[in-house]
């Protein structure tokens, strides 16, 4: 090896080795101080790229876990509002059950409806004002997507539904609306109600006054109706003619010769107190008669005594005593019971509803006048109409009864089957709450899975980029020793050219 001064090869070699050990020491210290095996791409280019992708996934999944927790919060907020809506619906149902009880007065029903209305308004308020981070969760149908993954499309959808009075089918819910008017309602709710019911018995038609019960014919100029005293048939005659008894038919002395002769023959030889019958009439002999049949006989009709004198039979011109007959009443046979009476007519009684029914009369429609307006009621009296429209009884704000037609009543008509309507609303709320409960459980599961994934990805990334302290400490110790040795050797190498100077002495 040549002895040169210009180039110290040993020094250069030592410097190079010293630089390497310095670089190794620097790398070890950097890794130990940062905790990372890869502090820059030069440390491990491929590993750095892989670790960076892991970092993206880890950060994305961590945020996704927070998103899922937000989803739980949204579901809890919505479900809490629905719980309050459910409480209001339960109270409305309770009030509706109370309202259907027949013991409630009009004021009771009004109070019940007032509270129901307040409850329904509260349901709408909860629907309109419940929100999460500025998003209203019950005021409209909405699908809210929650990002629960680190990549596109990894979402869970929360179905938010509009829940208010209208969507629940309770818009216009009413337990105290106007009810269909009946004839009974008109009589009880209004003053000075007049009118009549119509009946038909065969071809004959009648009217019955709804207040007095008087029966008249159904005509422009109605006639009063009576019940025939003899046969119970309906008639417009107020009396029936009784049958005159021939024996007492006349008061003239020239008449009744045949009757006188017949009576004379019956009492001939009779004694006082004897009785005999003639034409269904029982007579008593008042004076003893001889063989000529002359004498007096009497009978009692309607409590009044009637006396007949038979005289001048032997002369062949037997006559009823004129004076006696003129002071007595004509006698008739009643068409009702066949008894003798002084009345030439039997009075018929005014017909009543029961008489119409006895004659198999069939009830028809009714005409009812209220406050000057005439309404028509059907045969059963449970439907009242005006101009073809069904009438309802409503209450004014001051509680006064009033009649309105079906058009006006439609907007505030009582809800048909109110309990079924509320049950349907409760079922819808329950369905939405169940969905929200299920989605909360799903988010819980997603959060657990995300946590597991993040843990595993962190472990995988750690194995790639984290520093192994045992290895790095060993590397640092090795580099430190090499640094110390290199520095010492470099000093020796730098002394080698000094040996060449000895040749110049």
Curated annotation (Swiss-Prot):
Gene Ontology MF terms in the entry: structural molecule activity
InterPro entries hit by this protein: Flagellin (IPR001492), Flagellin_C (IPR046358), Flagellin_C_sub2 (IPR042187), Flagellin_N (IPR001029)
Pfam families, sorted: Flagellin_C, Flagellin_N, FliC-like_3rd
Location relative to the cell: Secreted; Bacterial flagellum
Cellular component GO terms held in the UniProt record: bacterial-type flagellum; extracellular region
Main function: Flagellin is the subunit protein which polymerizes to form the filaments of bacterial flagella.
PANTHER family associated with the record: FLAGELLIN
Note: Individual Salmonella serotypes usually alternate between the production of 2 antigenic forms of flagella, termed phase 1 and phase 2, each specified by separate structural genes.
Stated family: Belongs to the bacterial flagellin family.
Protein name stated in the entry: Flagellin
Protein species of origin: Salmonella derby
């Amino acid at each position: 090896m040549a002895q040169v001064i210009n180039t110290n090869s040993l020094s250069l070699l030592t410097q190079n080795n010293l630089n390497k050990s310095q670089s190794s020491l620097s790398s070890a210290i950097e890794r130990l101080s940062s905790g990372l095996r890869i502090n820059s791409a030069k440390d491990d280019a491929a590993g750095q790229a892989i670790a960076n992708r892991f970092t993206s996934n880890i950060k994305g999944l961590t945020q996704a876990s927070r998103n899922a927790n937000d989803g739980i919060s949204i579901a809890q907020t919505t479900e809490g509002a629905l719980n309050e809506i459910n409480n209001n619906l339960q109270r409305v149902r309770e009030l509706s059950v109370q309202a259907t009880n027949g013991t409630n007065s009009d004021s009771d029903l009004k109070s019940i409806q007032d509270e129901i209305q307040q409850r329904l308004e509260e349901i709408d308020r909860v629907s309109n004002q419940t929100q999460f981070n500025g998003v209203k969760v019950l005021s409209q149908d909405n699908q809210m997507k929650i990002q629960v993954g680190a990549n596109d499309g990894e979402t869970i959808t929360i179905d938010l539904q509009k829940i208010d009075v209208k969507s629940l089918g309770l818009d216009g819910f009413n337990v105290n609306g106007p009810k269909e008017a009946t004839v009974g309602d008109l009589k009880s709710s209004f003053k000075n109600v007049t009118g009549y019911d119509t009946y038909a018995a065969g071809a004959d038609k009648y009217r019955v006054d709804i207040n007095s019960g008087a029966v008249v014919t159904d005509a422009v100029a109605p006639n009063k109706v009576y019940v025939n005293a003899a046969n119970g048939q309906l008639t417009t005659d107020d009396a029936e003619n009784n049958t005159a008894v021939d024996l007492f038919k006349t008061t003239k002395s020239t008449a009744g010769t045949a009757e006188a002769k017949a009576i004379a023959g019956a009492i001939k030889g009779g004694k006082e107190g004897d009785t005999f019958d003639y034409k269904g009439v029982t007579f008593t002999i008042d004076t003893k008669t001889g063989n000529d049949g002359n004498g007096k006989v009497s009978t009692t009709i309607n409590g009044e005594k009637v006396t007949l004198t038979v005289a001048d039979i032997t002369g062949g011109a037997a006559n009823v005593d004129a004076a006696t007959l003129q002071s007595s009443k004509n006698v008739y046979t009643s068409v009702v019971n066949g008894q003798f009476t002084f009345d030439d007519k039997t009075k018929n009684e005014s017909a009543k509803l029961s008489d119409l029914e006895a004659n198999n009369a069939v009830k028809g429609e009714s005409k009812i006048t209220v406050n000057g307006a005439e309404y028509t009621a059907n045969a059963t009296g449970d439907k009242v109409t005006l101009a073809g429209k069904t009438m309802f009884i409503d209450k004014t704000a001051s509680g006064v009864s009033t009649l309105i037609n079906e058009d006006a009543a439609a907007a505030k008509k009582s809800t048909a089957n109110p309990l079924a309507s509320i049950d349907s609303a409760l079922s819808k709320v329950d369905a939405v709450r169940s969905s929200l409960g299920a989605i909360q459980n799903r988010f819980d599961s997603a959060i657990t899975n995300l946590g597991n994934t993040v843990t595993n990805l962190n472990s995988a990334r750690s194995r790639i980029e984290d520093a192994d302290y045992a290895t790095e400490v060993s590397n640092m110790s090795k580099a430190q020793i090499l640094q110390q040795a290199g520095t010492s050797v470099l000093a020796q190498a730098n002394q080698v050219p000094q040996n060449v100077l000895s040749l110049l002495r």
